[in-house]
């Protein structure tokens, strides 16, 4: 099992990737969505709206799963995080949501009245995740250990992903 301080985990948590967040629907099925996030070294923050299914699901069940991966076949790596979520409101929410938005949107987008203020008003709460389990994987390491570097020495073995 990995930890939040592992270099690969920190690279993924501090980088600009799209995460997949899973929550439980009232009927027990899984609700999974793509999200932007911010990592402060201990918690993960996701800007969202009280109107979203994920926020409503977390009101009754705070357990989450989060996956962040590189989406690069030649250097596939990722982290799976299980944790407990808390919904932040008010000033703490505005602070964290601002950091999430600034991580993914350019200064020009944030200043554009059609973009920045819309995100700020739509995302009225923040999901704060306290990780309880962290598991990381690195296909480059698996290639060296299991496949004798077959993929590294033959880049055409892995087909490109759709964009």
Which residues make up each language-model segment?
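Short beta-strand segments
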Residues: 17-50, 56-58, 64-69, 77-80
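Residues that act as N-cap/strand-start positions at coil-to-secondary-structure junctions
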Residues: 15, 31, 121-123
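Alpha-helix boundary recognition
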Residues: 13-14, 59-60, 120
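Charged, gly/pro-rich active-site loop segments
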Residues: 3-4, 77-163
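A generic local structural motif
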Residues: 5-8, 31-33, 51-53, 113-115
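Short, surface-exposed beta-strand-loop junctions and turns on beta-sheet-rich folds
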Residues: 52-54, 73, 143-144
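A short beta-turn/loop motif at secondary-structure boundaries
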Residues: 27-29, 72-74, 117-121
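Short, basic/aromatic recognition patches
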Residues: 1-20
């Amino acid at each position: 099992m990995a930890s939040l301080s592992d270099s690969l985990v920190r690279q993924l948590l501090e980088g600009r990737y799209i995460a997949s967040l899973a929550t439980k629907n009232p009927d027990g099925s899984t609700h999974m969505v793509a999200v932007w996030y911010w990592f402060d070294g201990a918690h993960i923050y996701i800007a969202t709206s009280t109107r979203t299914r994920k926020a409503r699901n977390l009101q009754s069940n705070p357990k989450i799963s989060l996956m962040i991966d590189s989406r690069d076949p030649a250097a596939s790596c990722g982290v799976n995080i299980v944790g407990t979520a808390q919904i932040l409101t008010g000033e703490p929410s505005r602070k964290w949501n601002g950091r999430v938005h600034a991580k993914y949107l350019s200064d020009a987008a944030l200043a554009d009245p059609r973009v920045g203020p819309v995100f700020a008003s739509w995302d009225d709460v923040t999901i704060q995740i306290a990780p309880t389990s962290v598991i990381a994987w690195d296909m480059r390491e698996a290639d060296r250990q299991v496949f004798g570097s077959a993929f590294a020495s033959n880049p055409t073995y892995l087909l490109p992903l759709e964009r």
